Amino acid sequence: MADASRLSANFPPATAEAWRSLVAKTLGDKPFSDLEKTTAEGLPIAPLYPPGDLPGGQAFPTRPFDSERPWDLRVLTAHPDAARANIEILGDLEGGAVSAVVRIDPTGQAGVAVGSAEDLALVLKDAILELAPMGLDAGFLGPKAADWLGAVAKSSPGAKLNFHMDPLSAFAEAGTSPGPIESHVISAATVGARLAETYPHGELFLASGRVVHEAGGGEAEELAFAAAAAITYAKALVRAGLPMAEAFGRITLGLAADADYFVTIAKLRAAREIWARIATACEADPTARIEARASRRMLARQDAWNNMIRMTAAAFGAAVGGADAVMLGTFTDAIGLPTAFARRQSRNAQLVLMEEAHVGRVADPAAGSGYVEAMTDQLARAAWAKLQEIEAAGGLAAALASGLIARDVEAAKAARPEPKLVGVNAFPPAKEHPVEIETPAPKSVEAPSPALPGPDSACPALKAIRLAEAYEAAQ
């Protein structure tokens, strides 16, 4: 007798061969390949994923499950004025954010004008560091900014600080480093090892692949870059005195979350698989810690209101993919600094997914999906092959200097099909409705130079792009 508790038990067994036979009748003279598609990155999409064709069982641990607060809602402040940046952070925390990142730029052109611990203290005034983790995005100033943050938090040794030094991303984006890039990695590791003694919960390095994504690279290139950066930083921390297991435990992976949420889901799951493989070989914790930031290359200036939907799709993909922290930015980021309204919309997009849609109530909800499992496996394999190429070239710094990374990014960019961008080259508005942005007065401060002794390093720069830019310029 059929088991009434299983719906499938009430139907005769189906096979892939029987399904394909029926499809052939429908297709007639057309080839079966007409049903096969590819993603924008060239990954194959099959019309059906029979259970027998799925990759093996899950090879990676997911993030620790917490149904009440499934991920860290993280915000970024880049307002040049320190006092205004402080107001933004406190407002975000009161509005539902869990943590914040301060982008530092002493010139005030691309971040908060901070040049000392005193400046940073003003930015973080009244923030309770034991409850609200604070992080940094400081480029080559990372080690100095990390010391500033450590000084600001000296009365809060239990604070979970995200120092997130990442000199390799700064090098890749700028195409040069003020002094040898190897010295910058060593300097960051030395500072990190010292701070690790005082802040046992601090995250020292951010091994981010987003610079590859923003320059037009594919998912495999982004994953390989992040993994290679993690290996470089772990080795540097070990040389600075940390045990291997602790070194890996102090590194966070940084990845981009795109509006193509299936790709985002698969990419984050593939990142966990790659991390587990590397960490297990080094006898470290195989559970990756991932910070997902919304892609900036997907944003449009024209009909920018659509960016809200793009951001929400990115947040959904990051959450379902298992990100530990999600930072969206705002829908006006392609135009200028956000208003309080734009910041609130960004927070609320995540809060609705978390509190109303209950996206985080299930651990790894995409597990078992043939499409997602196959894409996860394909991305992990492709990224692993590229990681081996990077390591064979001498590591990430050498691969950047040789042009290997830039060539891979350019090849991926050239192979990408023309995108369809709603409000730009598809369904443009009859009338543009401008968005409001902040236009602050210029602000800059004196700051120590990030330069280190020795000749500057150079590499082909990975310059950020926006997919909509060419279409907007043509109109």
What is each residue range found by the language model?
Residues 42, 96, 153, 275, ...:
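Conserved, mostly hydrophobic/aromatic
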Residues 201-234, 309, 315-316, 320-386:
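Mobile "lid/hinge" segments at catalytic clefts and subdomain interfaces of large enzymes
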Residues 227-230, 253-346:
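Glycine-rich anion/phosphate-binding loop at the beta-strand->alpha-helix junction
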Residues 37-44, 166, 208-214, 247-257, ...:
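A glycine-rich phosphate-binding loop feature that marks nucleotide/adenosyl-phosphate handling sites
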Residues 15, 19-22, 42, 85-88, ...:
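General structural feature for long, well-ordered alpha-helical segments within catalytic domains
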Residues 2-3, 18, 344, 348-475:
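Catalytic-core signal marking the mid-to-C-terminal active-site face
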Residues 1-260, 282, 287-291, 319, ...:
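Catalytic alpha/beta active-site cores
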